[in-house]
């Protein structure tokens, strides 16, 4: 599941992008 993508951690941001397809999410 995709969680809200708002973080300053590059590692988390990358994971988020992989999940949200751009971290918008």
From Swiss-Prot:
The keyword Disulfide bond applies. Belongs to the short scorpion toxin superfamily. Chloride channel inhibitor family. SUPFAM superfamilies: Scorpion toxin-like. The keyword Disulfide bond applies. GO terms for molecular function: chloride channel regulator activity; toxin activity. It comes from Parabuthus schlechteri (Scorpion). Toxin with unknown function in healthy organisms. On glioma cells, interacts with chloride channels (probably ClC-3/CLCN3) and MMP2 at the surface of glioma cells. This complex is then internalized via caveolae, thus inhibiting the chloride channels necessary for cell shrinkage and tumor propagation. Expressed by the venom gland. Keywords: Chloride channel impairing toxin, Disulfide bond, Ion channel impairing toxin, Secreted, Toxin, Voltage-gated chloride channel impairing toxin. This is Toxin PBITx1.
């Amino acid at each position: 599941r995709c969680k809200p993508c708002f973080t300053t951690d590059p590692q988390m941001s990358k994971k988020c992008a992989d999940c949200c397809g751009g971290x918008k999410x």
